[in-house]
């Protein structure tokens, strides 16, 4: 990229951002005084590769890319990868837990497809390999719930704290409902709730179990709805050992982290949020594997 002056690259970026249009050509003239000849070449491919490399580096570091650039390239493999990452970011923004985990596998496969022709993508190879390495333990995991645990740990490693809090809450609730009501199912699936009752609500069911199983400390303000109690009494299928769950840290997670964030509060600076979430996740993993 040394043939492209930095100022030209900056101006090109500015034009794309401000006009929301994609450059089709980037002509560069190279005059040779000795031969008195000038050569004009189109450096659009090099310019686009520099954008792609920057985006891959950003994703590798922050699990985010900017949607500012329009990726409408002639290379289908690169197109698929960039669109896959963009879709992942959209799912993350909207807290689509299952879709995010599924998207991780797609991104891994897109990287793999490009790396099969690594000689063609020499400048992108280091970023692709780094991304693949980062996602590999999620990709190879067979258990859906453990995949989610590993994904939350990845979010924590990249300082995506708020979404990690949301997904940790969802994971705990899913696995309680899963093993209390549907222990024969390989994983939690929301459509299974219809088998209990059409009016059943995942949030109410899971909140009821958190207190009924003494995972969270009981409160005078918590009273399960009658229909939830009836559903619970008719469907007591729990075969897991609840004592494997780290009740102390799960309580701290809900009272001092999750509930505070949900109500727009400020978490106490003395609370080690990452440490507490990791302890919760490790105990849920133990509950799944050993319970």
Q: Whereabouts are the PLM-identified features?
A:
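Long, low-complexity, Lys/Arg-enriched
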Residues: 3-291
């Amino acid at each position: 990229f040394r043939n492209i002056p930095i100022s030209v690259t900056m101006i090109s970026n500015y034009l794309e951002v401000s006009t929301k249009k994609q450059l089709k050509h980037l002509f560069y003239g190279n005059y040779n005084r000795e031969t008195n000849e000038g050569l004009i070449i189109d450096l659009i491919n090099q310019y686009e590769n520099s954008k792609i490399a920057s985006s891959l580096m950003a994703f590798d570091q922050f699990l985010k890319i900017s949607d500012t650039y329009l990726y409408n390239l002639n290379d289908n493999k690169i197109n698929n990868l960039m669109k896959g990452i963009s879709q992942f970011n959209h799912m993350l923004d909207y807290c689509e837990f299952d879709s995010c985990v599924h998207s991780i596998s797609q991104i891994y496969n897109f990287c793999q497809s490009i790396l099969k022709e690594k000689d063609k993508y020499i400048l992108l190879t280091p970023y692709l390999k780094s991304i693949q390495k980062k996602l590999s333990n999620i990709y190879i995991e067979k258990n859906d719930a453990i995949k989610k645990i590993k994904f939350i740990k990845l979010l924590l490693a990249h300082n995506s704290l708020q979404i990690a809090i949301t997904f940790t809450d969802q994971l705990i609730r899913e696995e309680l409902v899963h093993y209390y009501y549907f222990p024969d199912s390989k994983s939690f699936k929301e459509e299974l709730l219809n088998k209990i009752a059409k009016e059943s609500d995942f949030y109410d069911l899971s909140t009821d179990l958190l207190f009924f199983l003494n995972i969270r400390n009981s409160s005078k303000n918590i009273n399960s709805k009658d229909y939830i109690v009836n559903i619970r009494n008719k469907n007591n299928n729990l075969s897991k050992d609840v004592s494997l769950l780290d009740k102390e840290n799960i309580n701290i997670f809900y009272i001092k982290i999750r509930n505070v964030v949900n109500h727009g509060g400020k978490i106490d600076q003395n609370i080690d949020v990452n440490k507490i979430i990791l302890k919760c996740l490790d105990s849920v993993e133990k509950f799944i594997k050993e319970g």
